A protein has these predicted regions:
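P-loop NTP-binding catalytic core
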Residues: 1-18, 38
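ATP-binding Walker
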Residues: 15, 26-27
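Conserved P-loop NTPase
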Residues: 146-228
Length: 231
């Protein structure tokens, strides 16, 4: 990704917006996901989900969110809302799948964040895999997945999508805005086309900031990244 997109991703991860890496090969997704963990703020609580052995004993809200644990209770340091879950939401060895994947997605409504991988070459594929059994996440839950990066060749991010959670308008009506593209890679020009400018107010509001401050900070970080790349 270029400096502008990298700065945007940095800001969203730091602000607690979830992120999913899809597309590409399975190992490529894991490499990109783990590299992005370096952008999690220092001191943040990071909880790596244990695949098919995950029992969410660390999550106080698990029962309220519908988790039915069959494991004996055991003392653990509880995770805090705002903790970043790290997972592979995939039906693969070491992956978190089925009811556990659904619980991880549902936990986003309780203030947790997520950096994960998922299978699927397109956004529709990703959402389709997670909406069908055995995960069975509903649309309003999937809309909280935040940023979805689709890998192409390289692995390069070919498209960065933003999933927008349902919200109420001033009249109290529930609005479910469609996903939006943050950036797309153009093979013709060998550069990214950026569209996040149309979502600045929404992104800034989601992380608790002002649009002008968000734009300035993104530009500052992009400059830092570009300078480091040239060095």
């Amino acid at each position: 990704m270029d400096a502008e997109l990298a700065a945007l991703i940095w800001l969203t991860i730091e602000g607690g917006i979830p992120l999913v890496v899809a597309g590409g090969a399975g190992e490529e997704r894991l490499v990109v996901r783990d590299a992005l963990l370096a952008l999690v703020p220092v001191g943040a609580s990071v909880m790596r989900l244990a695949g098919d052995r995950e029992d969410f004993a660390w999550m106080p809200q698990a029962g309220e969110l519908g988790w039915r644990s069959t494991a004996p209770s055991r003392p653990m340091q509880p995770g805090k809302p705002g903790a970043v879950m790290v997972a592979a939401l995939e039906d693969r060895e070491g992956g978190t799948w089925g009811e556990a994947a659904h619980l991880a997605i549902r936990a986003l409504t309780a203030g947790y964040s997520l950096i994960a991988t998922a299978s699927g070459a397109t956004l529709q594929d990703v959402l389709g895999h997670l909406s069908r059994p055995p995960v069975s996440a509903i649309d309003d839950e999937l809309a909280r997945l935040g940023v979805v990066l689709l890998l192409g060749d390289g692995p390069r991010v070919s498209v960065a999508h933003y999933l927008r959670p349902a919200a109420r308008d001033p009249g109290g009506h529930v609005q479910r805005p469609a996903p939006a593209a943050l950036a797309t890679w153009s093979a013709k020009t060998s550069r990214y086309d950026h569209f996040a400018w149309g979502l600045v107010a929404e992104l800034a509001g989601r992380i608790g900031g002002r649009p002008i401050a968000f734009e300035r900070e993104q530009a500052r970080r992009a400059s830092v990244i570009a300078g480091a790349t040239r060095a």
